[in-house]
Amino acid sequence: MNRVATAAVLIPLVILALFKAPLWLFTLLVFGVAVLAAHEYFGIVRAQGFRPFAAVSYLFLALSFGSLYALAYFASIDYVDGAGGLAVILMLGLLGGLGLITLTAALVLLLGGMGRDPLSQALPDASVTLMALPYIGFTLGLLPLLRVPSNGALYVLYLMLLVWCGDIAAYYVGRAIGKHKLAPRVSPGKTWEGAIASVLAAAAVGLLLFRFIEPITHLLRSAALLAQPSHTYTPAPFRSAPLWLVVLFAISVNVAAQMGDLVESALKRGAGVKDSGTLLPGHGGVLDRIDALLFALPVGLIFIVTGLGRYFSDFSQ
């Protein structure tokens, strides 16, 4: 019951923030989620005997999200005002800035490690701290970028639905008929039957959403969640995409999501904990809820930049 109640509260809030929050507020909300997830991640690594430099990590998470917000902001100027190649140059510069942030964080953490006793903990503690940046910060930071175009929120929702539906299918099919363990050392409850059901469910949901994307778009518009059409607006982002590409996208997102789930399970099992936290009744912690999304978001970006870009009009302009 707690699981259903928590989902009933969170899902509408996520959709509302995704479609209605201004870019700065949406980025701030995602940053808040990243901080909560990082806090839980540090709890897991502490349970494994490490002593992360949490305060340093939060500082560089903030710097990373500031850079990603600037990237999303200048990208939005390009899409709205037609700034042309200027935004591309700024985007490349800001992406280089993320690399500089990572390099600076690594050096700062290594310097901080000199105060560790014993000194043999300096490198491990610095390493597990640095990992929070790409694992949580940079991945969640893709959300504001993917949301920038007029169809961006719809694309992010599409991606999230693929992750959620695959997760639900894996859970119930695995419980009902699962017999062959997928990764017994990492997550004894996961089965091959559940994993296959998750892939098939994602492919089916991807095709269904593709088939009914226009009525879904009209529904979102009527609920004032999506902007009314304009001369730059295309209501169906995948309407001309071949079916094989839609299926490939859904399966790729699903496989990445399952890998993300397994990675977090490995971290928790190594620490001897069941959940990353207790913030979400019936669901565990924040990291437990976004672990799959952390791996799925980069795949979503790759498809936009490569395979789906030409069919997603605002990204290819």
What is the meaning of each model-derived region?
Residues 269-292:
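Interfacial loop-to-transmembrane junctions
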Residues 175-176, 267-271, 294, 298-299:
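Re-entrant/interfacial helical elements at transmembrane boundaries that shape
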Residues 251-259, 286-294:
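Hydrophobic transmembrane alpha-helical segments of multi-pass transport and channel proteins
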Residues 289-305:
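Final/C-terminal transmembrane alpha-helix of multipass membrane proteins
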Residues 1-252, 315:
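Membrane-embedded alpha-helical bundles of polytopic integral membrane proteins
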Residues 165-175, 257-269:
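Short helical (or helix-break) motifs at transmembrane helix termini and adjacent helical loops
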Residues 304-317:
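Juxtamembrane boundary at the C-terminal end of a transmembrane helix
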Residues 8-9, 277, 294-295:
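Hydrophobic alpha-helical transmembrane segments of integral membrane proteins
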